[in-house]
Amino acid sequence: MNVRLFASRFVPKINFLNKSFGKKPFRLLDVGAGNHSATKIKSVFPSCEYHGLDLNKDYNNSEEDFALMHAFYEMDLTQLKMETIPNNYFDGIWLVHVVEHLYNGEEVMKALLPKLKPGGYMYIEYPGIKSTKLPSMYGSLNFKDDPTHVRIYSYQKLSNLFTENNCLVLGKGVRRSFGFIIAMPFRILAYWLSGKKLIGNIFWDILGFAEYLWIQKNPNQ
């Protein structure tokens, strides 16, 4: 058994990669590639050809992370200037907690679709409308806890957007990782015992902080 893969099933970003590709090699464009994302993904999917994209390189990555990347695209997505990203190339494009930082997220997602192969997958995750009603907490539990959040999106409207652009909606709704929900009391205890301050994302899944959308570009396109 691949222990890393089993444990990573708790992490929706990884779980949906596994649902999409399993053990097959794939080319991934990871939009929002900070926090050692390349290392985390390549440790579970060593045959992944990883491409990172972010506003700049200063989002908690090391030289080791960049060494694992086939390419890194440094750009402001809101400008919609994506000529340096190859068309019809990627098997997957992942946007995890990115679109809430973009005022024109729909246009960005439509501009990324030509980069995806026919039959390729896209996974989008972001704070949903419920996040505006949750209490404020260190590490973000309310949408406004992060001052760089600029806009709320909904999976209902995004579903329509992708359907209108010849894509199949494979999954949508409020993010609920039951592994994270089961692990929640143990995570809380671990933080208390270590003297660390509790962070908001411990409670995301039980409280329904985030929404997601999993789509496939029409294979016959």
Predicted regions and their residues:
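Residues lining the SAM
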Residues: 96-99
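Short, charge-rich binding segments
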Residues: 85, 114-115
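S-adenosyl-L-methionine-dependent methyltransferase catalytic module, highlighting the catalytic core
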Residues: 4, 78, 92, 103-114, ...
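Conserved N-terminal segment of class I S-adenosyl-L-methionine
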Residues: 1-88, 92-94, 106-109, 172-174, ...
